[in-house]
């Protein structure tokens, strides 16, 4: 093995199998590009992104870890989101949750 080399099993790797997903239409009404990373709590994404926020609470982009989606000014697109797993607690970002996703508005 070479240092830093990644060896994966043969065949396709499916991400987020069996997780709840959601499709959302998003538009960038800002004057600058907005980039959202793979594990960013989409509910708390930049306010220049216009979409129905309430249903996205507890969801992130359904894309490979370490990647992002960029929304250019004036651009609209539909993205696939996937529910957070594990403890389902969210801290940081814009500070809109700061704890458990369930049982809080």
Swiss-Prot record:
Keyword Heme: no
Catalytic activity, EC: 3.5.1.5
Pathway: Nitrogen metabolism; urea degradation; CO(2) and NH(3) from urea (urease route): step 1/1
Subcellular location field: Cytoplasm
Top EC class of this enzyme: hydrolase
Quaternary structure, from the entry: Heterotrimer of UreA (gamma), UreB (beta) and UreC (alpha) subunits. Three heterotrimers associate to form the active enzyme.
Protein name according to UniProt: Urease subunit beta
Native source species: Pseudomonas entomophila (strain L48)
